[in-house]
Curated annotation (Swiss-Prot):
It is found in: Nucleus, Nucleolus. Residues 33-151 are annotated as: Disordered. The gene is RRP36. InterPro entries: RRP36. The modification Phosphoserine is found at S14, S41, S42. Residues 85-109 have a biased composition (Acidic residues). It holds the Pfam family RRP36. This is rRNA biogenesis protein RRP36. GO terms for biological process: maturation of SSU-rRNA; maturation of SSU-rRNA from tricistronic rRNA transcript (SSU-rRNA, 5.8S rRNA, LSU-rRNA); ribosomal small subunit biogenesis; rRNA processing. It comes from Saccharomyces cerevisiae (strain ATCC 204508 / S288c). Associates with 90S and pre-40S pre-ribosomal particles. Interacts with CKA1, CKA2, CKB1, CKB2, PWP2, UTP15, UTP17 and UTP22.
Amino acid sequence: MSYYFKNLKPDLNSDVEEDDGNLLESIMANKSKREIDEQESSDDELKTLSFGSLKKAETVIDEEDFKDTKPVHKKPITTTYREESFDEDEDSEDQSDEDAGFFEEDSEDETHHGQKVPKKKSKHAPVEQSSKKRVPRVRNIPGLEIPRNKRSNLYQDIRFDKSTGKALDSSIIRKRYQFLDEYREKEIDELQKLLQERKFLSKIDQGEREEMEQRLKSMKSRLQSMKNKDLEREILKEYENDMNKNNNTRYHLKKSEKRKVVQKWKFDHMKAKQREKVMERKRKKRLGKEFKQFEFHNRR
């Protein structure tokens, strides 16, 4: 290389450096102009927007910021462990230890997947029954159950059961089973004879004797009440037949009229002493009512 090229040094005021400086200045000037134009255009666009649209945009931005800043609460995952069954063979134990072990972890979401939490039902809610369930052959029909206060230890005859669907007519039943009165009278006579025997009374204690006397008394009253009902039924039947002899349409008495007819018949067929007792009882009853109506008995 020649001596001229070795001693050659770049000049600071050369033309190349001047061109580069001019380019940089022009680029920076263009950039500043572009930024100013963009700011002016954005200001012009904001001026054209209405206050309602600006308010909506502000609310949307606030909601997005609130969602971003809201803390996320993670549910704690509880793990349940299920023990697996294992065989007695050593090979199966080795395989189970290598694969999964004796315990497996199940998350709460997997165990309760697809199951709804049952809500507590009210005690006043109606009874629910599945339509897929078969109806049982033997069912409890409402109205046929005997209430507890009317239950007895006696045997219930199915001929008088409500499930037959027939109305119970006491007169018809009484005619069918009137022959039982003979057996009842025999039982009463036997009890009376037993209570009159001294040997029998010496063998039993006082409690058993009182129980037998009470039983005899109840049997007599029951039989007498049945006979009184039969008599009243016959009296009313005769009276209605006499009343409806010449009538085309049959006339039936009311309950109050029936009671008066029965009382009149009994009074007519009483003895003299019985009539006097009845009249005296009625007189005392009437005097008691009049005595209660006096002024000095009224409360002030």
